[in-house]
Amino acid sequence: MDQDPEGVSVESALADVLACPACGSPFEPAWSQELLCRDNSHRFPVADGILHLAVESSSADWKVAEPAQTSEAYARQYQALEEAGRYNAMYERRASKRATTRKEFRLIRRHIRAQPPCETILDLPCGGGRLSGAIAEAAPEALILEADIGLGQVQYAREHGLPGRRQMFMTASGFHIPVRDQGVDAVVCCRLFHHLPTVAEQQRLLSELIRVARRFVIMTFFDYYSVKNTLRRIRAPFNHKPPKITMKPDWLRETAAGLGAELVSMPHLFYLFSGHRYALLRKSG
């Protein structure tokens, strides 16, 4: 089993962090090729340094009235390493994407550095590790849990890991995060909410992020009232483009408050040219 740069085994580093995504119980303390949950004997494989903890579900499983034909197709993307490689190469190749990444780095670093130092940070979805460097720069001593529903993305992130940094890798669903309540100091969740078409999915993800975070959550959303989305809505009757998947800041503020978190700030990625905002939610109490 892998060790982090400080010589601590995966089992030791994650003993008080992980929980079974199927039932929430802790895992048995010793594992090498699989994880076994203590209460219900659910088994999850460990292969090539990656913990396979993703479980599939939809809003039908959460006993809500909303239909469940939602983000399933998106969740199936990037299961293969080759697909993930093409996606990440696009961000490295295009000048506009590189500029966006630089701005995202600044926003992530600003949010993390504004909070007390972290020991554990969950990066979900980590993708191919595009934004992992920003987290590591802002929290150099933290153990970063790199998680994504796409196995190919996690494989790519592991192959392109950050030398000398403490990283662990796993597949995971944002709807069933395999982490104990308040199991990590913080969660970074970038570029996911705008892929979830229904309120049920958005609320489920938000509740999971706040559940597992002890101190704060950084998350992005596409603002319904942004300049970019306003122009899109104005043009829609003429160009017939479908509406963006958006979120209203008041909904985020009120929903987060009901889950025990305060919306502290939400700077724009680019005020005129992007609808994305980087929200910082701080846990109450």
Residue ranges and their predicted role:
Residues 2-73:
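N-terminal auxiliary segments of SAM/dcSAM-dependent transferases
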Residues 48, 54-115:
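Conserved class I S-adenosyl-L-methionine
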Residues 122, 128-176:
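Class I SAM-dependent methyltransferase SAM/SAH-binding core
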Residues 188:
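A conserved beta-strand element that flanks and buttresses the S-adenosyl-L-methionine
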Residues 203-215:
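A short glycine-rich, Lys/Arg-flanked "PGG" loop and its adjoining helix->strand segment in the class I
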Residues 214-222:
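Conserved beta-strand signature within the Rossmann-like core of class I S-adenosyl-L-methionine
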Residues 222-242:
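Short, glycine-/aromatic-enriched active-site segment of Class I SAM-dependent methyltransferases
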Residues 243-260:
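Short alpha-helix
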